[in-house]
Each structure stands twice: as C-alpha cells, then as structure tokens.
Amino acid sequence: MFLVRDIMYCKPGNARPMVQKFQALSKLLQQMGMGSMRVMTDVSAERYWTVVAETDVKSLEEFTEMSRTASARKEFQDVMKGYHDLIDQGRREIYMLET
C-alpha cells in the first residue's frame, strides 16, 4: 500500500477554491470506483494557505493507471481547469505504508 500526498501552496485567499476542486475531484474518483481522497488545510504548516490531498493506492502501477484514466476524462479536466491560477507551487510525496 502507498500513500500519495499532493501538497499545494496556494496564493493568498485561494486555499478554499483549491479545496473545492479537490473535493469535486474526490467525488469524481469515487464515481469511477477509484476510492476517495482526504483533503486537508493547514492549521500550522511550513507555509500559509497550504492544501493537502491524500490518496491510498495498492500499488504505484494502480496510481499511474488511475491518473491516466482520470486525466483523460472531460469531467476531470473541467474540475481542475484553472487550478494553476490558484497556486504558487506544489509537490507530490509518495510513501510506502509499513503498517
């Protein structure tokens, strides 16, 4: 099992719109049978206006296929349209779950 964590450092005032995009994306992934995401905002973090989305996957191959399948769908493209305007930068972390 792996945990995939997408960390977005939003521009001031844009954390809520990014949360809404991740929430809509989570619903879309659930409809596609791909599980749900945990969406979090910072209380205290490295930077203000941080939004984190986490997904558990069985394998990196599953994650790669899930990403390809979702990103090819118009619904996904509509949900994520304009998200670059909301963020300064972002990064992805992938962890192997040991327990």
Question: What spans do the regions from the language model cover?
Answer:
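Short coil/turn motifs at secondary-structure junctions
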Residues: 11-13, 58-60, 97
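Short, surface-exposed ligand-recognition loops at beta-strand->loop->(often short) alpha-helix junctions
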Residues: 9-20
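Absolute protein N-terminus
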Residues: 1-2, 99
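Short proline/glycine- and acidic-rich turn/helix-capping motifs at secondary-structure junctions
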Residues: 44, 84-88, 99
